[in-house]
Every structure is written in C-alpha cells, then in structure tokens.
Amino acid sequence: MSYDIIGEIAIIYPPVDDLDKIVNKILKHHKYVKAIYLKTDKLETELRLPKLKLLYGEPILETTYKENKCVFKLRVDKVYFSPRLSTERKEFIDLVKDNEKILIPFAGVNPYPIVIAKHRKVQIKSIELNPWAVKYGIINTKLNKVNVDTILADFGIAWKYIRNLHNKEGIVTKYVNELLKAKPELDLVYTNEEYYDLLNQYYNTKLIEELKPGIEYFDRIIMPLPKGGEHFIFEALVLAKKYIHLYSFAHEKEIEQKVKEIIDIASQLREIKHYDYKIVGDIGVRKYRIRINIYLI
C-alpha cells in the first residue's frame, strides 16, 4: 500500500487490497487533500504520463507542491513528478559548487534544476521532451525566481545542437504554447508513436531546421531518467567535463552488475577517474532506484 501527496492531491499506487481503508487514512492524516486518485496503469511511455481514476473529492488535476524552499506548479495527469525524490534532490545542493555549468536532460517540470539554482550560483540548461512538463518547468523557474534555460527537445537529437538551443526571448515558451494549443489531441497521447509524429511535425519544422549544429560542454550532467537513461550515456560523455550522475532501476541482486555494465560502456569512450553508486529509493520488493556517479578525467 503506497501513495504520494502532491500539494492538495493524493495518488494511490496499485496493488491495493482495501481502497476505502487507504482513502480514509489519507483523509485522516492529510486534512488539506482535496482530491484522491488511483493510478490505473504503469508509466510505460516515453512521457511517463499516468492514467488516473478519481476516488474522492474534486476533479482537480493542477496543484502546487513545496520542497527544499522551492515551489512547483504542475498537472498530475500531464507530467511525471515524484515527491519521494525530495531528499535526493536536496543532496545536489551539497554536491554542486558555485559557478558550475550544468545540463539536466529529462528534467520534467524542473525540480532538479530549480532546487540547485535556488541554492547555488550556477548556469543550468534543462531539456525535456514532454511539452506539458516544459510549460510548467518554465512557469516554475519564474515562480522560484531562478534562471534555468528550459528547452523542449529530444535529448537524443538535441545534444548536437545544444550550444544553439535557448529559450531566448521566450522562443521555447512560444513554441510550447503553440504546440499545446494546436494539438489538443496530446491530451490523449499515451504512446510514443503518436507523440513523436506530432512533435516531429512541429519541432523539426519550427526549431531544428533554423539552427546550426553546435556542441557545448558542461561541468556536470544530471540525468534523472531511471528507465532507459543509460541509453544516452554516449551523449552525456561527449558533453560532460567532470561529472555525470545517471539513474537506473535494478533488483537487489543485480545492482553491482548494472553499475558494472554502465561503467564498462562509459570507460570505452572516456577515461574514468572514479565512480560510485547510491541507492536512493525502492520501487518494489528488493527493487531499487540507484544513482551512479561518474567522475571523469
């Protein structure tokens, strides 16, 4: 039995033996909750969008969540967000030093970039594929009065153009708003194919063709995508100067092997000074979310 509280919204995760019991528990311990949803499917798509069933209260989907002296606005049905990673995000306040240049692909609504930028004098660029997450990511940078250059892009394509990708003069904000307004069917998109068809029609004609390729280098790259993030290790190794923080999922007995596989791939492309890993949360029985820290020469 597990659930998350995101602002005024509670989300229950299956399997659940007694829904009424957990709903009553939430209402007893979280008086401010106005809506309780059951997540009805796994986050299997690239956008990690949940399908939700309202169990109690008002059908509100947009909420405001606070952590680490930051505030985040989001729609729980349009973006992936985990309050369970609050402590993990806080750790980067100590890991990151002032004046670092940081890239964060798979940034969602910008929780990692904003928590870091709120506490450190840094230059951050974030990349996210989901236009809803980009929309809220830009809103959240303004709410928190921090400067995070937030880009709508597929990191697998955008890394080649990274030096020339900016939300300069609100160009990304404009594109995101146009995309969401012009393609209301995105409300129902849950498969990669449908989304990529829409995004490619728009993105390739509106942005990429107007840019020239250009590589940019970053002191630190943080990749908060545990499912499939390792597939982008090449791009990260090309762009990183010093540090890469990569997330993955692994069973208790497979953690060491998972880390070794990723490090073996990375060491073929770059010389590694040191690496370590940390378990940052559980996702099931003896299954964990891990962060792999790679220190480059």
Swiss-Prot record:
Keywords: Cytoplasm, Methyltransferase, S-adenosyl-L-methionine, Transferase, tRNA processing. Its main location: cytoplasm. Disulfide bonds: none annotated. The keyword Lipid biosynthesis does not apply. GO terms for cellular component: cytoplasm. One of its GO terms (biological process) is tRNA N1-guanine methylation. It catalyses: guanosine(37) in tRNA + S-adenosyl-L-methionine = N(1)-methylguanosine(37) in tRNA + S-adenosyl-L-homocysteine + H(+); 4-demethylwyosine(37) in tRNA(Phe) + S-adenosyl-L-methionine = isowyosine(37) in tRNA(Phe) + S-adenosyl-L-homocysteine + H(+). S-adenosyl-L-methionine binds at residues 89, 106, 128-129. It is an enzyme of class 2 (transferase). Its EC number is 2.1.1.-, 2.1.1.228. Pfam families: TRM5-TYW2_MTfase. Coiled coil: none annotated. Belongs to the class I-like SAM-binding methyltransferase superfamily. TRM5/TYW2 family. Catalyzes both the N1-methylation of guanosine and the C7-methylation of 4-demethylwyosine (imG-14) at position 37 in tRNA(Phe). This is tRNA (guanine(37)-N(1))/4-demethylwyosine(37)-methyltransferase Taw22. It comes from Nanoarchaeum equitans (strain Kin4-M).
